[in-house]
């Protein structure tokens, strides 16, 4: 919404899940920002401070939401000639994605992959990550990239234990 408020009116490509979340989240964020601006300005006027302007308004949030283009996983989108984009499941959180960007110019093709966290295999509720191949460049978040994660906990056994303890105490699940 902040770039929309400054005049950007182009399409915003995002996964379908991100589009759904942003519809709710951006309006909520705008509401919070407007409330905070009102509070800060009320307090600031008494102290002679300049007016606080929120990063964006509800109108900006509602406007930018109209520019979102939902992109299903695996579908190749062509936002401009010579450029194709494919969102794939990163398997990290519901709706997370890695992005494969292919650029063709002067008869050459370059593939760039952008990703945040990539999930583990065989997680409950979350699909395994889609692995991308033959990238020329990879731009990636790597907070825990220098660590070996070792053995993965047996989540089913842990959940079963919690359920059994709850029943043993007479609780409800």
Q: Residue spans of the language-model regions?
A:
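His/Asp/Glu-rich metal-coordinating catalytic cores
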Residues: 1-172
């Amino acid at each position: 919404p902040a770039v929309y408020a400054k005049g950007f009116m182009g399409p915003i490509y995002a996964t379908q899940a991100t589009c759904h979340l942003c519809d709710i989240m951006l309006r909520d964020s705008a509401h919070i920002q407007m409330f905070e601006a009102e509070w800060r300005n009320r307090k600031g006027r008494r102290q002679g401070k300049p007016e606080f302007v929120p990063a964006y308004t509800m109108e900006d949030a509602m406007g930018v939401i109209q520019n979102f283009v939902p992109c299903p996983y695996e579908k190749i989108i062509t936002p401009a000639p010579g450029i194709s984009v494919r969102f794939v499941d990163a398997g990290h959180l519901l709706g997370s994605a890695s992005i494969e960007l292919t650029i063709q110019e002067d008869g050459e093709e370059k593939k760039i992959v952008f990703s945040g966290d990539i999930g583990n295999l065989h997680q409950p509720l979350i699909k395994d990550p889609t692995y991308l191949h033959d990238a020329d460049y990879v731009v990636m978040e790597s907070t825990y990239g220098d660590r070996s994660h070792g053995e993965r906990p047996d989540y089913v056994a842990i959940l079963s234990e919690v359920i059994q303890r709850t029943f043993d105490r007479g609780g409800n699940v």
